[in-house]
Amino acid sequence: MSIRYESVENLLTLIKDKKIKPSDVVKDIYDAIEETDPTIKSFLALDKENAIKKAQELDELQAKDQMDGKLFGIPMGIKDNIITNGLETTCASKMLEGFVPIYESTVMEKLHNENAVLIGKLNMDEFAMGGSTETSISKKTVNPFDHKAVPGGSSGGSAAAVAAGLVPFSLGSDTGGSIRQPAAYCGVVGMKPTYGRVSRFGLVAFASSLDQIGPLTRNVKDNAIVLEAISGADANDSTSAPVDDVDFTSEIGKDIKGLKVALPKEYLGEGVADDVKEAVQNAVETLKSLGAVVEEVSLPNTKFGIPSYYVIASSEASSNLSRFDGIRYGYHSKEAHSLEELYKMSRSEGFGKEVKRRIFLGTFALSSGYYDAYYKKSQKVRTLIKNDFDKVFENYDVVVGPTAPTTAFNLGEEIDDPLTMYANDLLTTPVNLAGLPGISVPCGQSNGRPIGLQFIGKPFDEKTLYRVAYQYETQYNLHDVYEKL
């Protein structure tokens, strides 16, 4: 197997044993990008000069046996809404074209401290608003498993790059499923941690009460290794949780005999494709064969997840995106002749169609006369959804179900049909609304397109999710498939 398809864990061993230099790994990755990414279109910007320089510095440390850091010499790709000091961060939007940050996000500081090597910034839906990566102003990323299909979104570039062997891990952000859905579509492992587990400082805000940064990898243990590196409380983020336990690998490999798993009947109901249902039912039988106890439960407010999510997320977006006014930074209209025109024209020209749609929706939901009917009611529904999960977790350790109701759809198929596009978030938005951790792992394929299995856990119990996901992965995975793509 080429270095480009090696796991994070194996690369760490090869580097530690001095069988390969960090600079060799980085060179192999850039060769892979040059060969493959003109087709996949996952990267928006490369940081080649700095990456090679950093790798050469790590070579010197390797020679001195000073290989400090959990990710020493490991290449990484970062979603383009995560601030990177000195490297353009655009959120795949005209509004931020040419914007080069002068500070570092907390997750990037942590990864640099662990001696990971930044390869470049990855494509996404504009300002993380979309489910296919087609709203990007720059390019349309394709699914490595089927180039006619979308990679999912909004972290489509992050998922596609990992699946195609262009980086061993990437970071994405998940507001309503934006890590887990593309992970499912691209056949990789994607974790949305508990809200507050990972600092949001330096994440360009979409919906601040929902956003969470998380890792995408080709296997479960790699995912746990990366989450350990980026987790922890942060004084720069008042919503980060003061939780000391960031050990996610110690229970990987432990069996799941007696583990109580809940299967909500709503997760295999209306709107879920037959091929997805079959794959999930097969996965449930696998879990039973591993000793887990799987029982059907009800999460009755699941159907209200999408409408409440889109009201809340759009309302928060309309507030967060008000900072892009054409004055301080970002796109500045050249046609304006007054301050009012500058505001209007900069935002009209700088934002894409989907972003403007959500700003309009959010502004309407927060407006006088409609606040109680839409925003306030959506927050009440959010509480009901959280209560549903709390009730289930009184008796069960994890919840299982599909990640997405279908496999990846074709490029161009849903981009002009927002309601159909939004329906793809049926099974992921409730997890964000409740602030819970969720992980997607591959569980099958249909017509060559991957199917994702989602495990949902109790708050700050990512350790159990990794444990059950790892055991399932021993029975089904796509490790032998990636290189054939």
From Swiss-Prot:
Q: Which family does it belong to?
A: Belongs to the amidase family. GatA subfamily.
Instruction: Name the residues annotated as catalytic in the UniProt entry.
Output: K79 (charge relay system), S154 (charge relay system), S178 (acyl-ester intermediate)
Q: How does it assemble?
A: Heterotrimer of A, B and C subunits.
* A single BP term in Gene Ontology: translation
UniProt GO cellular component terms: glutamyl-tRNA(Gln) amidotransferase complex
What role does it play?
Answer: Allows the formation of correctly charged Gln-tRNA(Gln) through the transamidation of misacylated Glu-tRNA(Gln) in organisms which lack glutaminyl-tRNA synthetase. The reaction takes place in the presence of glutamine and ATP through an activated gamma-phospho-Glu-tRNA(Gln).
**What are the protein's UniProt keywords?**
ATP-binding, Ligase, Nucleotide-binding, Protein biosynthesis
Extract the GO molecular function terms from the UniProt entry. ATP binding; glutaminyl-tRNA synthase (glutamine-hydrolyzing) activity
Q: Which catalysed reactions does the entry list for this protein?
A: L-glutamyl-tRNA(Gln) + L-glutamine + ATP + H2O = L-glutaminyl-tRNA(Gln) + L-glutamate + ADP + phosphate + H(+)
Q: Does the keyword Nucleotide-binding apply?
A: yes
Sorted alphabetically, which Gene3D superfamilies does this protein's record hold? Amidase signature (AS) domain
Species annotation = Staphylococcus aureus
- Gene from which this protein is expressed: gatA
- Signal peptide stretch: none
Q: What protein name does the entry list?
A: Glutamyl-tRNA(Gln) amidotransferase subunit A
- According to its UniProt record, the EC number is 6.3.5.7
| PANTHER family in the record | GLUTAMYL-TRNA(GLN) AMIDOTRANSFERASE SUBUNIT A, TRANSAMIDASE
